[in-house]
Amino acid sequence: MRTFLKFSTLVSKGVLVLVCSFFLTASSNAYPIFAQQNYANPREANGRIVCANCHLAEKPIEIEVPQAVLPDTVFEAVVKIPYDKQIKQVLANGKKGDLNVGAVLILPDGFEIAPPDRIPEEMKAKVGKLYFQPYSAEKKTIFVVGPVPGKKYSEMVFPILSPDPAKTKSISYLKYPIYVGGNRGRGQVYPDGSKSNNTIFTASAAGKITAIEPAGKKGGYTLTIETANGESISEKLPPGPELVVNIGDIVGVDQALTTNPNVGGFGQGETEVVLQNPLRIQGLLVFFLFVLLAQVFLVLKKKQFEKVQLAEMNF
C-alpha cells in the first residue's frame, strides 16, 4: 500500500512538472504562479512584489475591499487589472494573441479563501471558474491566480473568509493590511534571467551590420555585426519583435535592434480592512439610542418649559 502511495505521489509530481513546463514554454514563466519556483516569499522586505522582476513594464491595478468586516464572515476582495481588450500581444511562437492576466493576493494571518460551502451563490457567479492556489505549504495566506483569459477575468473576485478571534486567540480586532500584485500580458524576463521574445533586443557590440538572415522555420533572425577590429558577432533574435535596422547600418553597444513588442505590464497595491468586534457595534448602537432618547427628552422638556412660561404670561 505504501509503495502504491509513493508511486502515486511521484506520478502526481511528474504531471505537475509537465503542466508547469508546458506553461513555461507555451505561455510565459513570468506569471505570478511561476514566482513560486524561485522565491519563498513573493513580497520582499522593501514591499516590492517579485513579479516585477519579470514584468518590467509598470501598469496600474486596483483592489477593493469593505472598510470593515465582522468575524467569521465571507466578503469580496475585487482585483481590477484594466487594459485595452483590443490589443494583441506577442506569443512565444512569435504570433499575435490575446492577453492573459494573473494575480497574487497576500492576506493577513487568519484570513483565507472561503470554502465553497460558505460562498453565497451570487458571489460564486462573480468568482466564475477562478482557481485560487496557495503560494506554498508555508504561505497559506498568499494565493495566486493565473494565467487566465484577460477578456473574461480582468476583474477578479476573491471570496475571503475573515477569522474569528473567539476561536483563534492569536487574532485580534485590528486593522489589517492586504497586498496585491497583478499583471496583464507576458513577461520580458524569465526567472533564469534570459529574455523572452516579448521585449526589446539590443546590440551586444558596436559595429556595422553585415548580414541579416532568417533563423529558420520558427521565425526570427540572425544578425551579423562586424566590429572595428574585424570580429564578427552574431545576434540571434527570436520571432515576435520587429527589426528596426538594416544591412549596412552602424550600431552602438545596447542600441535597439528591434521594436519593443510588450503591451502588458505589472502593478501592485495595498489596502486595509478592519476586523470589527460585534460588541463594539452593539455598544455603539446602544450609545446612539441613548443620545437619541436624550435629545427627545430635551425637546420635550423645552416644550414643557415653554408651556409653563406661556401660562404664566397669560395669568
Curated annotation (Swiss-Prot):
Keywords: Chloroplast, Electron transport, Heme, Iron, Membrane, Metal-binding, Photosynthesis, Plastid, Signal, Thylakoid, Transmembrane, Transmembrane helix, Transport. One of its GO terms (molecular function) is electron transfer activity. The keyword tRNA-binding does not apply. GO terms for cellular component: chloroplast thylakoid membrane. InterPro entries: Cyt-f_TM, Cyt_f, Cyt_f_lg_dom, Cyt_f_lg_dom_sf, Rudment_hybrid_motif. Its cofactor is heme. SUPFAM superfamilies: Cytochrome f subunit of the cytochrome b6f complex, transmembrane anchor, Cytochrome f, large domain, Rudiment single hybrid motif. It comes from the Eukaryota. Belongs to the cytochrome f family. This is Cytochrome f.
